[in-house]
Amino acid sequence: MIGKKNVVFGFLFLVLTAALGPLMVLKYQDWGAANGQRGQVVGYLQQLKAGEYLENPETLEDLSAKQLSVANAEAILAMNKLAATEQQIDFIKGGPHAHGNLEALLNIVVGIALCFIAAPVRLKQLASWLFILGSITHAGLLYLERVFMLPWANMLVSTGIGPVMILLGLLLMGVLAIKGFQGEPVKDYP
């Protein structure tokens, strides 16, 4: 069964990429703190605006230009911190987590489909390896780059070889399925 390695790889790869979910949850704690801080300082600015920036709402004293600029700076920094925290989560979510889960499931489906396709073994092996290597050189390298912060992985990802392999695998699977899809598992002969 040529597709077996894709099914096994798919489930193991899914464990790795799905495990990024709890990592992102841990980063949401930082997001919660940053969002709370932003709420406080922006709320203070809203109070100042309601008073037309003339007096401090807590002390009712006249507001100096320095106090107003400090309040603005604190609000800007708090919003920047919140955006940076969100960017860390999105950096993982939009890359290795989403693509990894998708490519893991794609390998599982391809592995099962290969069991039902009567075609030359070399072509089935080619399709199988295109999906495995495509997943490793796309989502796998995104994982290394974004989770372990290895910059060399980004250089390899940017070549686009991983997605190209997956697209070629999809094309090959489509052609093989047109000609050889059976309603029951097939036996492969070398």
Report each predicted region and the residues it spans.
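Divalent metal-coordination and catalytic microenvironments
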Residues: 97-98
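Polytopic transmembrane helical bundles with strong interfacial aromatic enrichment
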Residues: 2-90, 94, 108-148, 157-190
